[in-house]
Amino acid sequence: MNLEDLAKKTISEVSSIMEEQRRQNEILKEQELNRKTEIKDELPPMEFVCEELDTPQDLEDKISMAKFEEEQKIQNNIEISTQENKEFKKEEPFLQNEILNPSVMTEVQTLNEDIFLKHLRERILVLFEGLNSIKKDDLENRLNLTINFLEFLLANIEDKLKK
């Protein structure tokens, strides 16, 4: 047997194997189509209600937008309070001793901590609602998003503790 005959034999074997695989794929496709039509025939007609479902990317975008909006609100509140403090200092400079009073400072810190904890509670409740309403296939994406969110919260809490 020479090299040319061996090549022809190998090519014919490979082509027969490929032909068999193609035939098997066609049979599988036919079976799949038959199964789908059987399932459609068995099921009663359904009315489709279209609802816009959020994808994991949409959810991430909404969360990041909510975080951004909250940070903007905090910045606006800081700016407003800074402006009010400037006006307050201009109007009544003799009250500066009261501001430095430890009891007043404690009240302000307590108020700020209460606000922070309230916002933290709301964020965690939203997080739990999101985790409870998730489908099994999106679970990994949601868990990654949750881990990132919890890391963000932990960093905020650590910053508060340092102050």
From Swiss-Prot:
Domain notes: The Mitogen-activated protein (MAP) kinase-docking motif (MKD) is necessary for cellular invasion and IL-8 secretion. Interaction with IQGAP1 is independent of the MKD motif.
Protein name: Campylobacter invasion antigen D
Gene: ciaD
Primary location group: secreted
Effect of inactivating the gene: Deletion mutant is motile and binds to host cells. It shows a reduction in host cell invasion, induces significantly less IL-8 than the wild-type and has reduced MAP kinase signaling. Mutant is also deficient in maximal phosphorylation of cortactin at the ERK-1/2 phosphorylation sites and in stimulating membrane ruffling. Mutant exhibits reduced virulence in a mouse model of campylobacteriosis.
Subcellular location: Secreted; Host cytoplasm, Host cytosol
Quaternary organization: Interacts with the host cell protein IQGAP1, thus displacing RACGAP1 from the IQGAP1 complex.
Keyword presence, Secreted: yes
Origin species: Campylobacter jejuni subsp. jejuni serotype O:2 (strain ATCC 700819 / NCTC 11168)
Transmembrane segments: none
Highest taxon of source: Bacteria
Function: Effector protein required for the development of acute disease and colon inflammatory lesions. Required for maximal host cell invasion and maximal secretion of the inflammatory chemokine interleukin-8 (IL-8) from host cells. Acts by activating the host MAP kinase signaling pathways ERK-1/2 and p38 to promote both cellular invasion and the release of IL-8. CiaD mediated activation of ERK-1/2 leads to the phosphorylation of host cortactin (CTTN) on serine residues and association of cortactin with N-WASP, promoting actin cytoskeleton rearrangement, membrane ruffling and host cell invasion.
Residue span of motif MKD: 135-145
GO annotation, cellular component aspect: extracellular region; host cell cytosol
